[in-house]
């Protein structure tokens, strides 16, 4: 079955809508402009735009999470943003359920949804169909774990579930606590409880990247812009409303500003510290996407599974014609058959010409 293009826009027959239009994922490390490119593509395709950033699901955490601004959200509906209060622990299983339901709804309407974000586990929960442990939050256990220093919690996670710890930043208190909850509740590492059930619809994963020196410059510019927009005031307000021990306030950027407000970091050191730690986080994201999503350097990579195909490739986030590069890949992917007889090895290197 091939998808026809009408004026460059895919048109699926009603009988095919449960198998096609599939899913487009725009992923990559922080500060690569994923949200902007996803917005442009969503407007061009008429697609639902779904957030896959684990902090943007929370209300009130706006500036420090690089959440699309109200003006940007007014240009096109952004979904799975601002859906829970900061005091609620939103699990990967909850995200997966919400995302899968919205994707299924989009497919019934003949639409190709776009999933955008940098939280690898959120993305993998959808693209690989991970079986996420259904472990509800444990308030009493969490209160006990929150009394431990963050570095002790993370070190303990490294002992109990080293695989999960590899993919969690040492300063990510939310995910560290969640992984420990699962270990203590089930007696097994969270990483050992996940079983993949890949979806049968086609998936296109577009990873945005640039060399680390340029990415660090982008991180520095964005951090300065966040400060100018009132990030410190945002943190002050959140600390007054929820208290300084809120787990989300221990995450990247918010924790450093909290330390500054408490007099533990000089003002002159605050912004460089956030930039340095964000760069470290971006390197971990790159490692994760290369290893877990199969996005390889410099070429397209295809894997075939059942009725569906997952294709992933990197694009330079600073390319002047990036929107057109993305559009070229989307059109080629949509025009390709949804079933093929060749092996993954045979498919590699010839699915696209990036």
UniProtKB/Swiss-Prot annotation:
SUPFAM superfamilies: P-loop containing nucleoside triphosphate hydrolases. Its EC number is 2.5.1.75. Pfam families: IPPT. InterPro entries: Dimethylallyltransferase (IPR039657), IPT (IPR018022), P-loop_NTPase (IPR027417). The record marks 119 as: Interaction with substrate tRNA. Keywords: ATP-binding, Magnesium, Nucleotide-binding, Transferase, tRNA processing. It is an enzyme of class 2 (transferase). GO terms for biological process: tRNA modification. Residues 53-56 are annotated as: Interaction with substrate tRNA. Substrate binds at residues 30-35. It catalyses: adenosine(37) in tRNA + dimethylallyl diphosphate = N(6)-dimethylallyladenosine(37) in tRNA + diphosphate. ATP binds at residues 28-35. Monomer. This is tRNA dimethylallyltransferase.
């Amino acid at each position: 079955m091939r998808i026809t293009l009408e004026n460059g826009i895919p048109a699926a027959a009603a009988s095919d809508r449960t198998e096609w239009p599939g899913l487009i994922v725009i992923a990559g490390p922080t500060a690569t402009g994923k949200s902007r490119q996803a917005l442009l593509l969503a407007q061009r395709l008429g697609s639902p735009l779904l957030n896959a950033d684990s902090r943007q699901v929370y209300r009130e955490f706006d500036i420090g999470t690089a959440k699309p601004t109200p003006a940007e959200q007014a240009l096109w509906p952004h979904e799975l943003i601002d859906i829970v209060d900061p005091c609620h622990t939103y699990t990967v299983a909850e995200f997966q359920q919400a995302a899968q339901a919205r994707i299924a709804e989009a497919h019934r309407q003949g639409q190709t949804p776009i999933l955008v974000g940098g939280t690898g586990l959120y993305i993998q929960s959808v693209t690989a169909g991970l079986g996420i442990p259904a472990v509800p939050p444990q308030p009493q256990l969490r209160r006990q774990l929150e009394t431990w220093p963050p570095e002790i919690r993370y070190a303990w996670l490294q002992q109990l579930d080293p695989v999960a710890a590899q993919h969690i930043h040492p300063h990510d208190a939310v995910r560290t606590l969640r992984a420990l909850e699962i270990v203590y509740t089930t007696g097994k590492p969270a990483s050992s409880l996940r079983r993949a059930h890949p979806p049968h619809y086609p998936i296109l994963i577009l990873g945005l990247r640039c060399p680390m020196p340029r990415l660090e410059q982008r991180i520095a510019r964005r951090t300065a812009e966040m400060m100018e927009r009132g990030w410190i005031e945002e943190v002050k307000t959140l600390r007054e409303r929820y208290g300084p021990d809120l787990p989300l306030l221990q995450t990247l950027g918010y924790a450093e500003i909290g330390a500054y407000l408490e007099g533990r970091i000089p003002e002159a050191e605050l912004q460089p510290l956030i930039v340095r730690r964000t760069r470290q986080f971006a390197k971990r994201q790159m490692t994760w996407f290369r290893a877990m999503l199969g996005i390889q350097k410099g070429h397209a990579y295809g894997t075939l599974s059942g009725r569906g195909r997952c294709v992933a490739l990197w694009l330079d986030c600073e390319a002047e014609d990036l929107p057109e590069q993305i559009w070229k890949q989307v059109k080629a992917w949509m025009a390709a058959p949804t079933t093929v007889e060749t092996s993954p090895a045979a498919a590699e290197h010839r699915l696209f010409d990036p």
